[in-house]
UniProtKB/Swiss-Prot annotation:
Keywords: Cytoplasm, Immunity, Nucleus
Underlying gene: MIR155HG
Tissue distribution of the protein: Detected in dendritic cells (at protein level).
UniProt protein name: HSPA8-interacting micropeptide miPEP155
Intracellular or extracellular location(s): Cytoplasm; Nucleus
Keyword Protein biosynthesis in annotation: no
MF terms (GO), sorted A to Z: Hsp70 protein binding
Amino acid sequence: MEMALMVAQTRKGKSVV
């Protein structure tokens, strides 16, 4: 799992795991 990617997605408003 990409931590940076996950954080970026979550910050955008998308919860992608």
